Every structure is written in structure tokens, then in C-alpha cells.
Amino acid sequence: MAPPNTIDAGLTQRHITTTAAPTSAKPAFERNYQLPEFTIKEIRECIPAHCFERSGLRGLCHVAIDLTWASLLFLAATQIDKFENPLIRYLAWPAYWIMQGIVCTGIWVLAHECGHQSFSTSKTLNNTVGWILHSMLLVPYHSWRISHSKHHKATGHMTKDQVFVPKTRSQVGLPPKESAAAAVQEEDMSVHLDEEAPIVTLFWMVIQFLFGWPAYLIMNASGQDYGRWTSHFHTYSPIFEPRNFFDIIISDLGVLAALGALIYASMQLSLLTVTKYYIIPYLFVNFWLVLITFLQHTDPKLPHYREGAWNFQRGALCTVDRSFGKFLDHMFHGIVHTHVAHHLFSQMPFYHAEEATYHLKKLLGEYYVYDPSPIVVAVWRSFRECRFVEDHGDVVFFKK
């Protein structure tokens, strides 16, 4: 799907700018970029030991709270059509869709915690809770757990990362950088993007944010190019190994059970009823998931690495922390504003990640990336400016 952005700091962090650099010269942040040389040992040692402690009881309490909110919202929604005033109904349904989408995104995050085994010390509990919660949201739990683990193990790697893999110069149809025609065509491309009608950009943003998540699961959209059809539902997909066969079957059965329940409800009630109570909130979950992950891994100042320069900690730092506001940060269980810590130590439970981030900032300095830009500004900038990377080079940055 997308690429990285700009970052300027205070004393300890870079910070996003909105000034576009000429296509003929490298931006200052790219010219001055130096590879981080931290070891994973020194990064881990800067974080208090208790931040790595997991509590199944605490995890289950968060699940209970989120499921309670989802149930209360559902029950409240059953009263909406009883209002005689149509204006109240027209206002109440969107309010339900938005709030239920937010709550269910939080539930999705808790299932994601289970997949990382950060939910509790019990693998059985983690996988049981994760399978139930993700199946409810039409996510093949083990299938995505496996591909997501590979993403964490190879974040920022041009040929091994699993999602948000940037297209190269040749893949977008530009001539080699060294050719005389390249500068002219690149300039033409830049002008074309600048002049592209905002409504066109907005249209493609809506398509990506609403349908990008199921497209990734079904056909590996924005994922690594394996040269053949790839899907999270296919047991022999190149994402998986033969030993994953039964995990994929179990994942598919969970999604099929959820789809069966939705089809049954549609037959007993109506498709319109299922659409109002489930499908529209589900689309809002898709929106939040793609928005969150797009912004975490897409920014002009974040590098991508090839084999010669990549290592785990460098790749883990190729992500951006940002805030969606205290309410959403809380409802999304810190996945937005503590993502750097999560990528460095994915088995750290989310409720300790904020404290860990505090210590990481002090150690990482300018290599800790936080973007305070308004979300709308950040999305627009990344969507229009992060188009491709060069075909060659161990360290590459997004180009417009």
C-alpha cells in the first residue's frame, strides 16, 4: 500500500515537515542519514524488567470490558428504529456505526496481542482467545498471526517484509535513474501528481481504507510479490510452510463459522438488519486498521533496507509513533502511540508499552520517530508523496 514520511524533533525526536524537496536532489534528511548502530541488548536493557511481564487475568479483563462496550452499543442500537423522529434515527445510526467500529477495532487489537503471545504466558489461552475474537471479525487468526510474525521479523526489508512493501522505480514504469529520460519523466510524474484532482486522490484513499484490509487477506494486496496468487485463506500459499497446514484450516473454519452466522441472521432477520448492526461497523474497523498501519509504516523520512544494510533493530525502528487523541489511543490499546516499542519487543503487553516508550525515547534520540502532524495532514502527505523507491541501494527512501 504505502511508504514513509517527514520528521523533525525537539531535542530527542525527529518531526514531520511539509516541504517537498526537488526531485533532482536528495532531501537533507536522506543526505544526512546515518544507520542506527544500537544492539538489541542495549535497547532491551534500557527498559525496566517489569514491562515484559504478562498477565492473563489483566488481558481477560480488557477483553471483558471491550465486549461489554460492544454489547451495550448493540443493545442501544436495537432502540434506534423505535424513535418516531427520523432525524434522531438518521443521527443515531451513524453514531452507533462509528462507536462500534472503534470498540471492535480495540477488540481486534486484543486478538493481535494474542497472536504475539503478549496477552498471557499461556499459549493455549492466547490462541483460544485470539481465534475467537479474530474469527468474530472475519480474520483468519493463525494465518494472519503467521504472516504478521514474518512482518515483525523483517520490517523495512525490501524483499522479506510482508506488508506495505514499496514499489520500485521500475515497477511504477519509470526509466532507470541514470538515464537522461528519467529526470524528465520523473518531473512529469511529480507535476502530474501535484495536479491530480483532490477528488481522485480522495476516491482511492476511500477504496484503500475500506477494502484494503480484506484485499490484503484475500489476495495479498500491498504484500510481498511471490510471483503467483497469494492468500491468507489458501493452505499452500507461499506465505506458509507445510507445517502450518492445520493452522490455516482452523483459521478458515473460524471465518466460515462467522460468515455462516451472518448468513443465518440475514435469512432470519434481513440483510438490511445485518448490514446496520454488523457490516457497516465492520467497514469502520477496516478503515481504522488500514489508516493505523498505513501511517505507522508510511513516511518520507523512514528508510527501507536491502540485505546489505538491514538488521532487526534497524527494521523495527522503521515505524512512526503518533497520537490519535487520548480517547482513541485508549480505545485502541496504545497500538498507535507506542508502535515503536511494539516492533522492538512484540511480546511486551500493550499496557506496559507507554512506560517502555518513555525509556526508549531517551536511548534512541533522533532515531525514535514521532509525528505530531494532524492525522488528515499526515495521511494526505504520505498518500501523495510516498510513491516508489529506487531499484538499487542498500538504503532507500520514498520518492514522489
From Swiss-Prot:
Record carries keyword Electron transport: no
Pfam families, alphabetized: FA_desaturase (PF00487)
Keywords, comma-separated and alphabetical: Fatty acid biosynthesis, Fatty acid metabolism, Lipid biosynthesis, Lipid metabolism, Membrane, Oxidoreductase, Repeat, Transmembrane, Transmembrane helix
Topology in membrane: Multi-pass membrane protein
Keyword ATP-binding: no
GO CC, any one term: membrane
Reactions catalysed according to its record: (9Z)-octadecenoyl-CoA + 2 Fe(II)-[cytochrome b5] + O2 + 2 H(+) = (9Z,12Z)-octadecadienoyl-CoA + 2 Fe(III)-[cytochrome b5] + 2 H2O; (9Z)-hexadecenoyl-CoA + 2 Fe(II)-[cytochrome b5] + O2 + 2 H(+) = (9Z,12Z)-hexadecadienoyl-CoA + 2 Fe(III)-[cytochrome b5] + 2 H2O
Entries under CDD domains matching the protein: Delta12-FADS-like
Residue ranges of the motif Histidine box-1: 112-116
EC numbers: 1.14.19.6
Superkingdom, taxonomy of origin: Eukaryota
Residues annotated as transmembrane: 91-111, 199-219, 245-265, 277-297
Annotated metabolic or biological route of this protein: Lipid metabolism; polyunsaturated fatty acid biosynthesis
Any Gene Ontology biological process: unsaturated fatty acid biosynthetic process
Motif Histidine box-3 boundaries: 339-343
Entry's localization field: Membrane
Gene Ontology MF terms in the entry: acyl-CoA (9+3)-desaturase activity
Span(s) of short sequence motif Histidine box-2: 148-152
Function of the molecule: Catalyzes the desaturation of oleic acid (Delta(9)-18:1) to linoleic acid (Delta(9), Delta(12)-18:2).
Domain notes: The histidine box domains may contain the active site and/or be involved in metal ion binding.
Family: Belongs to the fatty acid desaturase type 1 family.
PANTHER family, per the entry: OMEGA-6 FATTY ACID DESATURASE, CHLOROPLASTIC
Record's protein name: Delta(12) fatty acid desaturase
